[in-house]
């Protein structure tokens, strides 16, 4: 399992971070058209959960093959990887929206298996350095009070933990040291949430069509 990946923002014009897609490929493409995304100059980083619950799961999974797209591993990628492995728990995945895979035709199933294998290479944490700012992108949480690139982490905490956001919503807000901004998904909300230097950008695209993109580099950031 890959834990950390570092991205040098100077290689790109504009950079956006997108919330949980959950198979909402057309919604994303429409958003990218609206913002004038240029796949030769710009970069899109996903907070994970590309698949499950929505209708266009293979299309969303295929995004990880494109050079203009990066993603961290979400709990739904992990359930897919585990469910398709020999020792995996397929029922856990099915209960959480994985049924789409078992309704694919033969060709799409072969493609989805290959993409799931590639998804097993996704990092848990992306560090983006953009000019003088450091952004850390994880699916659910960075489970420490201070960030350090390469620090050992419990992968289950990174992709599942809701303790920090729960505390923040109850008024117990703590900054995470070591980076300027932390961007998470995983916990759906009506609008993006911000507590101290943490942003939560899962706005329930698969439930209500509201997909959030946050620009972190370029004009408008």
Swiss-Prot record:
The active site is at residue 76. Its EC number is 3.1.3.16. It is an enzyme of class 3 (hydrolase). Coiled coil: none annotated. Mn(2+) 1 binds at residues 20, 22, 49. Belongs to the PPP phosphatase family. This is Serine/threonine-protein phosphatase. PROSITE patterns: SER_THR_PHOSPHATASE. Its cofactor is Mn(2+). Mn(2+) 2 binds at residues 49, 75, 186. Binds 2 manganese ions per subunit. Keywords: Hydrolase, Manganese, Metal-binding, Protein phosphatase. One of its GO terms (molecular function) is bis(5'-nucleosyl)-tetraphosphatase (symmetrical) activity. It catalyses: O-phospho-L-seryl-[protein] + H2O = L-seryl-[protein] + phosphate; O-phospho-L-threonyl-[protein] + H2O = L-threonyl-[protein] + phosphate. One of its GO terms (biological process) is RNA decapping.
